[in-house]
Regions:
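Active-site rim recognition segments
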Residues: 211-292
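Cysteine-centered nucleophilic/redox motifs
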Residues: 150, 154-156, 182-209, 226
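Secondary-structure boundary elements
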Residues: 108-183, 191, 258, 268-292
Length: 292
């Protein structure tokens, strides 16, 4: 199944507007998933499809040093020694098994379980969602919230709970999403984080890019997803892409949303500088030759 492209985004400002929910450039997956900003992507002629479990990409960004520093927080991604910083290009090896690399401290985990201005799970609207989730998964839930199955259940539940995928919203709070049952990937991730935290599961929102391979090609989209601390690791949960589980996907993080207070929109501007303007999928041999 292929994405239907509505309009392509080619500027950093477009990435900011998609985070804010403004109508600039979007695509839709089927009829049951939210919209995403399309990022220009090309594939070198000597790269064959389907893609392997690891890909090598050149990523043009506004602030390559900052973008590279963010990637150090994950396993399954590595920067090539051959960097074109003067052209704002990062050469990256990216695995489809990307996951957070840094083990959080007790204080960090406490922060990712907190009720905040954006992830406001103590609000009545979100508590209603929590009750609905527990009613549906009570037999599986038990008293073990640390199992990755809970993350899968949260993903499935939020994917079905948001019944009107749409890009007409600004970046909404969890309680707003709980009431509207509408939104794009940011709304999916905010509500999923709220549900997890209400269950005492540390959860965070990641902003970045997802590269998706479907039957006829490869495309890249500005995106937001979750990571939840389950089974002693950061486990990815992506309710917005739940219906695309059969497709091969590569996640390229740009920002961990840490400021969930009143100044959250200022914090999101950090993601702008790390978001790709252009992605080129290259062969492994090209990058090895460049490193040598």
């Amino acid at each position: 199944m292929k994405y239907k492209v509505l309009k392509a985004s080619k500027t950093l400002w477009a990435f900011f507007t998609v985070l804010s929910g403004l109508l600039l450039s979007h695509v839709s997956y089927a009829q049951s998933s939210p919209t995403f900003a399309l990022i220009p992507l090309t594939i070198d002629e000597d790269v064959s499809l389907p893609l392997d479990e690891k890909i090598w990409v050149d990523v043009k960004v506004y602030a390559p040093n900052a973008a590279g520093a963010v990637l150090s927080h994950w396993r399954g991604v590595a920067l090539s020694q051959h960097q074109q910083l003067q052209n704002s290009v990062l050469s990256i090896m990216l695995s489809d098994t990307l996951e957070g690399a840094l083990e959080p401290t007790t204080d960090v985990l406490a922060n990712y379980k907190a009720n905040t201005f954006v992830i406001d799970f103590e609000e009545k609207a979100v508590q209603t969602v929590v009750e609905a989730f527990l009613n549906e998964y009570s037999n599986e839930q038990g008293n073990e919230n640390g199992n990755t199955r809970v993350g899968d259940n949260i993903e499935t539940f939020i994917a079905s709970y948001i019944s009107e995928p749409s890009y007409i919203h600004n970046f909404s709070f969890a309680s707003t999403v709980a009431k509207s049952r509408s939104g794009d990937c940011t709304e999916y991730s905010v509500l999923a984080a709220a549900l997890a935290r209400a269950l005492a599961i540390p959860a965070r929102v990641i902003v970045g890019t997802v590269i998706v391979e479907y039957e006829s090609g490869v495309e890249a989209y500005g995106h937001a997803w979750n990571e939840m601390w389950l089974d002693g690791r950061w486990y990815r949960v992506d309710a917005a892409m739940h219906d695309a589980k059969v497709l091969k996907k590569f996640y390229l993080p740009a920002h961990i949303m840490d400021n969930e207070g009143i100044g959250y929109s200022v914090d999101l501007t950090k993601a702008i500088l790390n978001m790709p303007e252009q992605i080129t999928v290259r062969s492994e041999r090209e990058l090895i030759d460049a490193d040598n």
